[in-house]
Structures are given as structure tokens and as C-alpha cells.
Amino acid sequence: MSTQTKPSIVFVHGIWADGSSFSKLIPTLQAEGHDVIAAQYGLDTLAGDVAAVKSTLARVSSPAILVGHSYGGTLITAAGTDPRVAGLIYIAALAPDADETSQSQLAKFPVTEVFSHIEVADGRIWMKPDGVACFAGDLTQEEQKLVWATHAAPAADLFNQKVEGTAWRSKPSWYIVANKDRTVQPELERFVAKRMAATTFATDSSHVPMLSQPDFVLDVIRKASNAVRKNMAA
């Protein structure tokens, strides 16, 4: 067991985003004594993205908490079975079971508004500029423009791919429901949070509470960190 006093934090982004989507959280957590890193990956294949998350785990001390946003929830569900992972935090995220894909989980609930504002080109799924209001509508106009300018488009078949691993069945989990989400159905978020028996928090945010309500998200991370620290000391 590591002698560190606080778990490391590994951020795992969703589609139409990258590691900078956690920029309002990272400096505070670093100042509070955590090793922090944001995984980066190509959104080309699910297996490749999971492998990238596991490789990123090796760059910080163990144990670690994985924090997954949106599609990042699918990644931490698979990568979180790694013994270096002590807990999982889901932010408005998917959390497929062993017999589900990201797409099959989304399909269990009504289609959200953002999917009327996408286009497929060159084998990738791009968000149109007018889709940002459905993705991050509670940010300033300047921030929304930055979100679009930096959004990473996934491979068109990414959400239909599967890998093994259902970490929320064996690791302590926390979940942040975004009540005003127009990208992932809030009903889906509440369903998966209940199914995994997660410690659940809810806030009236868009799909990106880590950008629109960073203090709320930081408080949840602190609560999860304190719980993991108690387990580390046991």
C-alpha cells in the first residue's frame, strides 16, 4: 500500500471534449495535495481508449480515483477493474453493464436534443456549433465557443464497441446527476446511479457541471477522497 496521504485523481473525458474539460478542478486538487492527471486518447476505439486510461494510471501514485465524464464513464467502468483503482466518480456519465454498450444504454431512454445538432463526416461524429447550447448551455457564450473550438469528434462506431470489465460492481462509486442535461438523459443518469448503488448527488446543471459548477464537483471529489482514505487506513 502506498504511503501517500491522499488518493491520486485521474480524470477521464467524454466525447466532444478532452482533458482540458477538467481545467477548473485540477489546480485546486493539486493545491490540496493530490497527484492529478487527465487521460488523453483518440476516441478511435473503445479498447484503445481504455488502454490509454490504464497507461495514465501508471503516471501517478496508487491508489487512485477515476473520475469519468459522459463517455468517460464507459471507460472507467472498464479500466476501473485495475487493482490500482480505489474508487469511481461518474459525472453525468454512462456506466454500461457487461451486456451493454454505450449506445445500447443510451437507446433505453429518449434521444436528447444534442443529437439533432450533429453530423457525420470522415468517419467521425461532429457537434455542430449550435449543438453546444445542448451540451454546455449554462456556460458563458465565450466558454461555449471554446468548448466547440476544442471538441474532439469520436469515431462513428465508437459507442457500439464493447470491452470487458464492470468496475462499479466491485468498487465504491459516486455519481453526479446533471438535472438539466440535454446530452445524456437525466433519467438515464439516475437509473445507472441507482443500479450501481452509488453515493449520488444531483445539481441543476447542463452536461458539463465540472465547468459550470466546479465547486459542487470538487465537493463530491473531496467526499469520495475522504472515504477512500478511510479505506486506505483500514
Task: Name each model-derived stretch.
Residues Q4-L46, A64, A78:
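Conserved HGGG/HGGXW glycine-rich cap/lid loop of the alpha/beta-hydrolase fold
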Residues G48-A64:
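Conserved acidic catalytic loop of the alpha/beta-hydrolase fold
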Residues G123-W168:
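Conserved alpha/beta-hydrolase catalytic His-Asp/Glu region
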Residues G42-L43, D204-V208:
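Histidine-bearing beta->alpha loop at or near hydrolase active sites
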Residues T81-P129, A155-K162, V192:
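Flexible "cap/lid" loop of the alpha/beta hydrolase fold
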Residues Y175-V177:
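Short beta-strand/loop motif that positions the catalytic acidic residue
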